[in-house]
Amino acid sequence: MKNARTTLIAAAIAGTLVTTSPAGIANADDAGLDPNAAAGPDAVGFDPNLPPAPDAAPVDTPPAPEDAGFDPNLPPPLAPDFLSPPAEEAPPVPVAYSVNWDAIAQCESGGNWSINTGNGYYGGLRFTAGTWRANGGSGSAANASREEQIRVAENVLRSQGIRAWPVCGRRG
């Protein structure tokens, strides 16, 4: 009785208490079987001549998940509606010139960037044709934009300095 109580307690703790028919209950009564007798052809049991059984996966283990194509440890990417809208185009950055070219043009030509007086000097900063071409200008300075004339004037300033405008350069 003590063994039955211990077995019932252990089964209840393990959660494996199962009802069975009385025929399946083992007892100590002699059933006419000799456990030490040689096994007959109908006996089922261990055969030392057979190779070991392959390891089988446990029955309760779910199949391994297929490769999902992403790292499950990382958060999912943001949905397209949560992405920030494209940035608006910033206004162009104003160009910082090394001198005040408008002040020099005001002194040289009265601020007229397309002046051609016929004296061999052209545009608001009064370029000669040779100086204009040598410093990256194309066509005539009188037909060039203010920005183009200033670009060429910056090249002249780097090669000749402000003395290229001997009277009006000091105003820049």
From Swiss-Prot:
InterPro entries: Lysozyme-like_dom_sf, RPF. Induction: Expressed in actively growing cells. Transmembrane segments: none annotated. GO terms for biological process: negative regulation of gene expression; positive regulation of gene expression; quorum sensing; regulation of cell population proliferation. Residues 1-28 form the signal peptide. Keywords: Hydrolase, Signal, Virulence. Interacts with RipA. This is Resuscitation-promoting factor RpfE. It comes from Mycobacterium tuberculosis (strain ATCC 25618 / H37Rv).
